[in-house]
A protein has these predicted regions:
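Short beta-strand elements
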Residues: 78-87, 188-210
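Compositionally biased low-complexity segments at domain edges in trafficked proteins
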Residues: 95-120, 208-225
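Substrate-binding clefts and catalytic carboxylate motifs of secreted carbohydrate-active enzymes
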Residues: 1-106, 119-124
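Short, hydrophobic beta-strand segments
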Residues: 55-60, 154-173
Length: 225
């Protein structure tokens, strides 16, 4: 927990069967945490350890679950919200790559993130369906990982876990267009287009070193994409 600023986080999701009663766990660096369900206060949590607050026997209702953190004087310092996510509506594909581009050096890699989302673009936290990928253009499939036979190594059919997974592709030595398509049962296909950047080569050698283009990060917080 970053103690340089006030933060609050509800562990888990808020999509459960009707009549579910369960504990809710909140991580916060405030002095007290209050839980609200659809605007109604459920009281203050029990402090189990320095950062962990527990709310026992919370009756599930679809909607909005909020944790509000207070300092020692009762002033609000941070809050976090979970909402019930709707039915799966589509796949969302995102490329994560070097800020200076995806280089055609035969070694550069790009991450493909696939998410199952509802109509509002919120990730479906209980979805574990299999996504089928196709790849065309100047890249090679290096795959991802998932629970199952051989952990789906290099498999182009990859299950999501809690609505998300990632796979790697590697550039070829020729710059060009790359098209990735993702399909899953019951959902429309998603398509993503990437373009690799040419790399200067002299006598079979290149002076492009991707590690030199990435800036160091010393700040605290979530890992940046």
């Amino acid at each position: 927990m970053d103690t340089d600023k006030f933060q609050t986080y509800i562990i888990g999701h808020w999509n459960y069967p009707e009549h579910t009663v369960k504990p809710v766990y909140v991580v916060s660096n405030g002095e007290q945490v209050e839980l609200l369900l659809n605007g109604k206060s459920l009281g203050k949590g029990k402090r189990e350890s320095h950062f962990l607050f527990t709310f026992d026997k919370v009756a599930y209702q679809p909607g909005r679950l909020e944790a509000v953190s207070y300092d020692g004087k009762g002033r609000e310092v941070s809050r976090y919200t979970l909402s019930t996510v709707g039915e799966a509506a589509r796949l969302e594909l995102t490329a994560i790559q070097n800020p200076e581009g995806f280089h055609a050096d035969g070694a550069d890699m790009a991450l493909l993130q696939v998410e199952v989302v509802d109509k509002d673009g919120r990730r479906c936290p209980l979805d574990n369906r299999t996504v089928r990928f196709t790849l065309k253009g100047e890249a090679e499939w290096r795959g991802g990982i998932a629970k199952g036979k051989d952990n789906h190594i290099l498999d182009m059919n990859l299950p999501v876990e809690c609505g998300i997974n990632r796979a790697l592709i590697r550039s070829t030595a020729k710059a060009g267009k790359i098209v990735v398509t993702a399909e899953a049962e019951g959902l429309p296909a998603a398509r993503l287009t990437l373009q690799t950047v040419p790399v200067k080569v002299a006598d079979g050698l290149s002076d492009y070193l991707p590690q030199l283009t990435l800036k160091g990060r010393l700040d605290k917080g979530e890992t940046p994409l």
